[in-house]
Amino acid sequence: MTAAASDPHNPRSSADDTASPRCESGQGSFFGRRKGHKLRPHQNGLIEHLLPRLSLDPGASGPSDPATLFGRPVKEMRIEIGFGGGEHLVAEALAFPRTGFIGCEPYVNGMAKILSQIEAHDIGNIRLLAGDASELLAWLPRASLARIDLIHPDPWPKRRHWKRRFVQDATVAEMARVLRPGGEFRFVSDIADYCAWTLSHLARSPGFLWLAERATDWHNPWPDYTMTRYGRKAEREGRRAAYLRFRRESDAAQA
């Protein structure tokens, strides 16, 4: 835990935060569905016509069988919170066509980018939520997910904004509820303080076990990891990311 916190990571500037879309909802509040660059006409068309067909509504009754969300059989289901430009989520969906994916992203530009990729590759195993990730977790049934990914989230570096970080005791408890035993929460960040924060919150949850035995386990991406645009930028600027994996322990193992 302390090793992750001691790496010399450089905090992102506020300009980088704006350029790097993220979905944050620490205590059930939704911090900003925003729009950056002006959308092209085709992107506007995708937002208007394709997004409604793929969007989920946590205000509706929760699905007893989440596989029904995809209109075809899926072996398991994963979610990615704050997918940004969608590079990682699209790569995962193409690599695992029998897995259902839900992506949460509040930024309209991020939605437009991933919709373009979904259309171009005819991807049928992605569903989307342009809203609060904590509402999505609360909406899903117990033990319904195989994995949750949180990749380069907004670190909210100012102390008064820490409550806006996605990783909070309440969201960790919700992740433990919706992940099946053996499922994983995966976290990537180049911000040392947020890595230490995440390790601290997960360490005090009996539902999770940090899957690291040596420093190389969290210094390097897991096999087949797709680097995001922000991740490549961080590497170019000399900022090392931590790649943290936490396994959902069974209730029997916790006893």
UniProtKB/Swiss-Prot annotation:
S-adenosyl-L-methionine binds at E80, E105, D132, D154. It catalyses: guanosine(46) in tRNA + S-adenosyl-L-methionine = N(7)-methylguanosine(46) in tRNA + S-adenosyl-L-homocysteine. Its EC number is 2.1.1.33. The active site is at D154. Residues 1-37 are annotated as: Disordered. It is an enzyme of class 2 (transferase). PROSITE patterns: SAM_MT_TRMB. InterPro entries: SAM-dependent_MTases_sf (IPR029063), tRNA_(Gua-N-7)_MeTrfase_Trmb (IPR003358), tRNA_methyltr_TrmB_bact (IPR055361). GO terms for cellular component: tRNA methyltransferase complex. GO terms for molecular function: tRNA (guanine(46)-N7)-methyltransferase activity. Catalyzes the formation of N(7)-methylguanine at position 46 (m7G46) in tRNA. This is tRNA (guanine-N(7)-)-methyltransferase. It comes from Nitrobacter hamburgensis (strain DSM 10229 / NCIMB 13809 / X14). The gene is trmB.
